[in-house]
UniProtKB/Swiss-Prot annotation:
UniProt-recorded name of the protein: Aspartyl/glutamyl-tRNA(Asn/Gln) amidotransferase subunit B
Region listing for Disordered, in residue ranges: 475-496
Record GO biological process: glutaminyl-tRNAGln biosynthesis via transamidation; translation
SUPFAM superfamilies with a match to the protein in the record: GatB/YqeY motif, Glutamine synthetase/guanido kinase
Broadest EC class assigned to this enzyme: ligase
Protein role: Allows the formation of correctly charged Asn-tRNA(Asn) or Gln-tRNA(Gln) through the transamidation of misacylated Asp-tRNA(Asn) or Glu-tRNA(Gln) in organisms which lack either or both of asparaginyl-tRNA or glutaminyl-tRNA synthetases. The reaction takes place in the presence of glutamine and ATP through an activated phospho-Asp-tRNA(Asn) or phospho-Glu-tRNA(Gln).
Keywords on record: ATP-binding, Ligase, Nucleotide-binding, Protein biosynthesis
Family annotation (Gene3D superfamilies): 1.10.10.410, GatB domain, N-terminal subdomain
GO molecular function: asparaginyl-tRNA synthase (glutamine-hydrolyzing) activity; ATP binding; glutaminyl-tRNA synthase (glutamine-hydrolyzing) activity
Domain of life: Archaea
PROSITE patterns referenced in this protein's UniProt entry, alphabetically: GATB
Length: 496
């Protein structure tokens, strides 16, 4: 086909993801080495098993299997009655054994799905499979990137960390959809308590991208023949949701430009260079046969059926969001904020147990989360100060302090200076003004603002707001605005 003919055809991007999730366990998947100290010196959290030394035998970590079953249940996947491990053979510096213990034709989970929303359109993404494997070591390129470095250092501390690889069907049609999926997946994993999103390298993505002629797509479905006839590019080294969207946007554009120029899309593996914002060719893409899979003889088949029903999962984000809307009468935006992580949802429910849910939602969703985000903090950072936070809400609810002062002064100093609410109120002199002080301030504001008084009597609504502001200024913000409004109207009516 000529370049002109190619340029006239309409193509659709077809994307599938392979998401590598580090499971949060105390030890590695096949040995007793710790996974907890991410700041350990390089190559100190290792043993003969994770270094692949002769004679060392793997022992499966039960906690990793339990975590995998939880993922399967959360994804509504079929969980295998019996599963098996295989050796995936390839040579790379971060793989000390020259093979990776993974799963081939007997994954622990298959045929799942995950709901996502993109621009208010909700749909299901099909999960082809999810299997357990061990993480390789990590590489640090010195003096450049992967293709320009002077040399590369290898750290095997990560080798053997439990990984779950979640493989989607090629269900994505845009980079934005992949970002929405990764956001949702991370949210679910955090709720399960098996994943730490703050850990370095805890979620890494490989993406497969093809351009398919739009006429070969029927109602969103793509024929097997169309998929098999299109050359596919795999992009590696994606380590964030935002990075995934950027990498895929670049790669889709690169492929479109190539097609429009009449060039063939090479079937290859490319590396996402985040610093330069481009993908770089690494090698021709391996076929499945290149890995020479065969059963791992040192690990017997695993009968998951014997205990998978004993493994439970918590209420998941979508269900909790819906419950919050119904039980606490929250709007969709507030419910989404308050269920963004399990820790936030738990925190809110603890506050809502003590106060009106609407008040609790306002304070947690609008005030607290905003101040925490500004400081790059999370709810987990103030878990031990829960009583102080509820005390602040109680002071506002009892009208011992104004909402404005509580939000703009007390809460901020509580977080910045680690002070109690009482300490901030005392140091800033923020206690409520007594009634005599407020009456005096009201009288003064009226006497000093004859134009505003005249405007009020002329029916101009803004005049009363101006006078309230004057009183609040005189009382240092310690008066109750609603009471000030009432007192002002009373005195103004008396002056008619």
């Amino acid at each position: 086909m000529t370049a002109t003919a190619l340029a006239q055809r309409d193509f659709t991007a077809v994307i599938g993801l392979e998401v590598h999730v580090q499971l949060e366990t105390d030890t590695k998947i096949f040995c007793g080495c710790s996974t907890r100290d991410n700041n350990a010196e390089p190559n100190t959290r290792t043993c003969p098993v994770c270094l692949g030394l002769p004679g060392a035998l793997p022992v499966l970590n039960k906690a990793a299997v339990e975590a995998a079953v939880k993922v399967g249940k959360a994804l509504n996947a079929d969980i295998a009655e019996k599963t098996q491990f295989h050796r995936k053979n390839y040579y790379y510096p971060d793989l000390p054994k020259n093979f990776q213990i993974s799963q081939y034709d007997a994954p622990i989970c298959s045929d799942g799905q995950l709901s996502i929303s993109v621009e208010d359109n909700r749909r299901e993404v099909a999960i082809r499979r999810a299997h357990l494997e061990e993480d390789p070591g990590s590489l640090t390129h010195q003096g450049g990137n992967i293709d320009t470095a002077e040399y590369t250092l290898v750290d095997y501390n990560r080798a053997g960390t439990p990984l779950m690889e979640i493989v989607t069907e090629p269900d994505f049609r845009s980079p934005a959809e992949t970002r929405a999926f990764l956001n949702k997946l991370e949210e679910v994993l955090e709720y399960l308590g098996i994943f730490d999103p703050t850990a370095d390298g805890s979620l890494r993505v490989d993406a497969n991208i093809s351009l398919i002629p739009t006429e070969d797509i029927d109602n969103g479905s793509i024929t097997t023949a169309a998929l098999e006839s299109a050359n596919r590019t795999e992009v590696k080294n994606i380590s964030s949701h935002k990075g995934a969207e950027k990498a895929l946007a670049y790669e889709v554009t690169r492929q479109r430009n190539a097609v429009e120029r009449g060039r063939a899309i090479e079937q290859e593996t490319r590396h996402w260079d985040e610093s330069r914002g481009i993908t770089v060719s690494m090698r021709s893409k391996e076929a499945e046969k290149d890995y020479r899979y065969f059963p791992e003889a040192d690990l017997p088949p695993l009968a998951v059926a014997d205990w998978k029903d004993q493994i439970s999962i918590p209420e998941l984000p979508d269900a909790r969001r819906e419950r919050f809307r119904e039980e606490y009468k929250l709007d969709s935006e507030s419910a989404a904020k308050l269920t963004s992580t399990k820790a936030v949802a738990d925190f809110f429910e603890s506050v809502a147990d003590q106060f009106d849910p609407a008040l609790a939602a306002t304070w947690v969703a609008d005030n607290l989360l905003g101040e925490l985000n500004y400081r790059d903090m999370t709810v987990g950072d103030i878990d031990d100060r829960f009583d102080e936070f509820t005390q602040l809400i109680e002071l506002v609810d009892d009208e011992d302090i104004t909402t404005k002062n509580a939000e703009e002064v007390v809460l901020r100093r509580m977080l910045d200076d680690e002070l109690t609410p009482e300490a901030v109120i005392e140091s800033e002199g923020l206690g409520r003004a007594d009634e005599d002080e407020v009456v005096t301030a009201v009288t003064g504001a009226i006497d000093e603002s004859p134009e505003a008084v005249e405007d009020y009597h002329a029916g101009e609504g803004g005049a009363i707001n101006f006078l309230v502001g004057q009183v609040m200024q005189k009382t240092g913000g310690s008066a109750d605005p609603s009471k000030v409004n009432t007192l002002l109207r009373e005195q103004l009516e008396d002056k008619k």
